[in-house]
Amino acid sequence: MMITKKLYQCMCLLCMVIALLDVVSSDDAKEQKMKDKIISLPGQPPNLNFSQFSGYVTVDPAAGRALFYWLTEAPRPSGTKPLVLWLNGGPGCSSIAYGASEEVGPFRVNPDGKTLRLNLYAWNKVANVLFLDSPAGVGFSYTNTSSDELTVGDKRTGEDAYRFLVRWLERFPEYKERAFYIAGESYAGHYIPELAQLIVNRNKGAKNPTINLKGILMGNPLVDDYNDNKGMRDYWWNHGLISDESYNDLTKWCLNDSILFPKLNCNAALNQALSEFGDIDPYNINSPACTTHASSNEWMQAWRYRGNDECVVGYTRKYMNDPNVHKSFHARLNGSTPWTPCSRVIRKNWKDSPKSMLPIIKNLLQAHLRIWIFSGDSDAVLPLSGTRHSINAMKLKSSKRWYPWYHSHGLVGGWSQVYEDGLLTYTTVRAAGHEVPLSQPRLALFLFTHFLANHSLPSSPS
């Protein structure tokens, strides 16, 4: 009896300690959240009607890996709006540099590199948007273990992003169980399905999962090496960008090769094909050519980087290297190392990169996750033809055949097809490049709003 009583007392004491630790942990999270609140960014417009937070979440204490985030909440009250995580690709490119500063974020950097203007088509008008620099070593994210940047790949990036979400939600508990989506572009065609798969697997058996994943949205994504190589070749030849000889060489050497690390013969075929493009921007073949790179060789290497167009981030680069901006963002940066939009070290040393995301995408559909994929039809980097080949390879059931969709001005915004009783939607965006929200911001917001509402894009003018 005495032993039972003592055991009971010990159990009660243990419960009290655990409860106390939970309270302390909760208080620490609240305190850190308030420290993360952005009072004002340098040069930001006055009288904003939304809140911003930014800072770090440690994902591996032993290695000292910490990921940087920037949360731009929806206009107040934001409590009913979903949470959307935005990821850029590369691999090795910053979501703060591209997604936040050039595409779907609330601000654009002015030509002076010092002041900001409002983005009229910011996605935080309809959702709370969370931008993440991933993996560690990209943008403002960092690691205290230098070898991390030489050994990272898809697997660790996904695991770290999952840990980030779990720990970030402790800091922002109001977003627990909130409708959650993952969006992004380019190599995020790997990041997004892989992270979604982790969430789905770890949510199994949970009645009210903390990460309430509802769907994913991918723009001009890399999802399958074979089909993307095939689609790239087709797009280049069909648009008159390359010769018959280059078409044949790409067919011979590149179809079964790696997108990230092509072998010698494929590399030679790609370089020859690129030399035939002339003075155009492959990220948007109908836009003025990029003049950032000093030589054609540098231009081709930058394009082959297959991350994001560095030509569009000149103003952002200047802004993000301002120490006052770092202070306002609560960002840590080595004073001797300038902020860069992409990490060439990470890109060059990327380790694991599965050849195809199609099996994962099919698994996500079987888990009844909603998937939208969109393509800017002027992108020659990861063109629409590759994505269409990939979707066809999955042999999905068509629910609504190919049709033109119309935006709010009654004009054709692109073309779309719906599969698997509405679970997967594919759509193109007219006159848009690799970064659709950059070249067609109005259409991108229109598409995003329909995605969140689970409404098909309109098939007739309104």
UniProtKB/Swiss-Prot annotation:
Mention one GO biological process in which this protein takes part, according to its record: proteolysis
Tissues of expression: Expressed in seedlings, roots and senescent leaves.
Pfam families, alphabetically? Peptidase_S10
**In the UniProt record, does the keyword tRNA processing occur?**
no
- Put simply, this protein is called Serine carboxypeptidase-like 28
**Molecular-function annotations in GO:** serine-type carboxypeptidase activity
InterPro entries found in the cross-reference section: AB_hydrolase_fold, Peptidase_S10, Ser_caboxypep_ser_AS
> What is its subcellular localisation?
Secreted
Keyword annotations for this protein? Carboxypeptidase, Disulfide bond, Glycoprotein, Hydrolase, Protease, Secreted, Signal
Q: May I ask which residue range the UniProt record assigns to the signal sequence?
A: 1-26
Q: What class of enzyme is it?
A: hydrolase
Q: What does this protein do?
A: Probable carboxypeptidase.
Cystines in this chain: C93-C342, C254-C266, C290-C311
Which domain of life does the protein's organism represent?
Answer: Eukaryota
UniProt cross-references to Gene3D superfamilies, sorted A to Z: 3.40.50.11320, 6.10.250.940, alpha/beta hydrolase (3.40.50.1820)
Catalytic residues at S186, D379, H434
